Amino acid sequence: SGIENLSLIPGTAGAAVYQNIGAYGVELKDVLESAKVLDIGSGEIKTYSNKDCKFGYRNSVFKTNKKQDLIILKINLRLLKNNEPNLNYPDLAKMFEGKKPSALEVRNAVIEIRKNKLPYPAEVGNAGSFFKNPTIKTSNFQFLISKHPDLKGFDQGDGTVKLSAAELIEKCGWKGKTRGNVGVSGKHALVLVNYGKGTEEEILDLAKEIKNVVRDQFGMELEPEVEVVGGA
């Protein structure tokens, strides 16, 4: 067990390391032992430890250091023989209240949650979560909830609170909105979708409009989680 919470995230093993994918309380950094990497410049194959990967929130050394031409060839994961389910995510905790589920049961539950909340990329064009969940100081969060008392925050235990970008966007009235050929998913406000003929420019314009609205209403600056290749 160890990666069941990451079930149904589309992509490849190398991309999982590059992005430090995460969902439902688990990130790849929690289970990665090492990665074999090809340095195209020197032709050398190197082994990167977990520490060498310099993981951050949806980030890694492979993402921040683009000057080096590196290809992730293979990854080694450290999984647990004894099942220790991570039920920190509220929906999972509710589903398994008073029970210790198996890794397979958690996997099936995560798949069910994802299918209900997120459009599948093969059916509706999207890149998953478009924005990162912002983190602010606890003192700033206290000020924020004095104006928005129903706003949820997740204490990080280090003097900061993580907010739900989806909740911020939804409270601004953007869930399910469309702009021409693109829009915000009606299933999850953090997912921007292409209904078939949308362009990169339309998606980026939509993202900019959402960022501006959230900034105006909450004073929060949303950062993209997706990586834009090239430019409109």
Describe each region flagged by the PLM.
Residues 3-34:
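A gly/ser-rich beta-alpha-beta helix-loop segment of oxidoreductase catalytic cores
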Residues 45-201, 217-232:
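Phosphate/pyrophosphate- and phosphate-bearing ligand-binding catalytic cores of soluble enzymes
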